[in-house]
Amino acid sequence: MNGAQFELLREYLGRPPTLNQYFIFKPQARAIQRIMRFDTDVFFALIKKNKKRFFARIGGSASEINARVLSYFVKQRATTKVGRILSIIELQSVLVNSYTEIMGVLTLPAPPVYNSVVRLHYCSMERLAEEVLWSYNVAFRSGKVMGRHCVSNLVVHVNKLMSEYLRRHNRTAICYGSYSLHLLNSRIEYGDIDILQTNARLFLINLAFLIYFITGRNVLLLKVPYLKSYIVMQDEEGRHIIDSFNIRQGTMQNVPKVLVDNIYIIDPVVQLMNTLKMLSQIDRLEDLGERMAKMRLRLATLLEYARYHHCVSFGGGARLRLHMRLDAGARIVLVDTRCYGLGYRECRCYLDEARLLQDISKLNADAAVVDFEAVSNSVFLIHQGIMYTYFSNTVLLRSEDAIHDVSERAVCAHITLYHLLVGCNYQELLADLLNSLVSREKCPVVGVVARDKKVGRHGVIDIEKDVITH
């Protein structure tokens, strides 16, 4: 037994470790040493600056914040449970090793903001956007309220921090969704801020602690099994605060992006393709009638961006020439792509991801698989004239065996998305897709092919209960 390590553990635990505790915590000695040397006074000063800048209207006094900070760094002394102590060590280590770099820098003087995007006349597309949405409004509401509508009152404060975070960390974090469109068109309202980043877990743990130290409120971090690399933060009542997808640095570098006011946003045309895919999801389509005004502004902004930056001529272009059918037994949408020079004659859109991955493994072509992670929500493989990919939304039917126009355009958007992401062969397909958004006839949805059902357990990080399961 090492005497120095024993004394370190005794000081950290506030009591002599048992023999069992000594050997369990011994591998953590270096991390514990860093925790013991951590300057909580400097840390407290950073927390106060963060409060003044981002949470000025809520939270406790300086003495209350300091008490929470000091209390957390001796929290391990109040329990003898080995699992809880190991969780505390891990969470304290996150603060010690990353808080200053991730959150502390947000209090430094801000760099100059560069307006690096052309401001367009987005209202010119509102009439077209309205026609598109009315032709899409073909689903009856089920009355089910989705969880995404339950928003925490912490969101407004977190958003202020997030906008600065995206500016300071624009090499590792990128924005999409309504806030990114607000940066292009200030008329667009936004709720929470949607982000992709390369260190989502570390960031959200630090944010959870910042909220706790300032307000005393305990939030949860949930890892959702049916969304890859996705973590959502919820308040005590299960209301949404913020979520984030984690992506690799390679994906961050390769995804098409636009710099707006020092914030990188995912290329709006990529976002337009994902919007068209989303509208094939039956619950999203059911919401359309109530969200028409908001969606009109967003869609008009995306369409005008596509018109200007990709020279799309609306009203005079050809309509889609992709022909597709559903193999209901295999749950695959088969798309004939020979009318376009895409580099393959057929696209097979699997509705079950596990089946796709199984079939790809049989082809022995793993090296050719392209994966843009959460940006595309699918891998892509082109092999012997066939594209293999996964379509993650429901497929809507206009008759028992015919795919609805809404889902046909969504599948086409998924294919176009791939070509936008790799930067080739998308111009003609994109133009035809966008000129086909208004349906010639408004057919009701008569059937729905369910989306892929993912199984698994939620992972949890709960700093109040010292629980880490992801």
From Swiss-Prot:
Pfam families named in the record: Pox_polyA_pol, Pox_polyA_pol_C, Pox_polyA_pol_N
Protein name listed in UniProt: Poly(A) polymerase catalytic subunit
Annotated active site: 192, 194
Catalysis performed (reactions): RNA(n) + ATP = RNA(n)-3'-adenine ribonucleotide + diphosphate
Keyword field: ATP-binding, mRNA processing, Nucleotide-binding, Transcription, Transferase
Catalytic activity, EC: 2.7.7.19
Domain of life: Viruses
Organism per entry: Molluscum contagiosum virus subtype 1
Subunit structure: Heterodimer of a large (catalytic) subunit and a small (regulatory) subunit.
Gene that encodes the chain: PAPL
Family: Belongs to the poxviridae poly(A) polymerase catalytic subunit family.
An individual GO BP term: mRNA processing
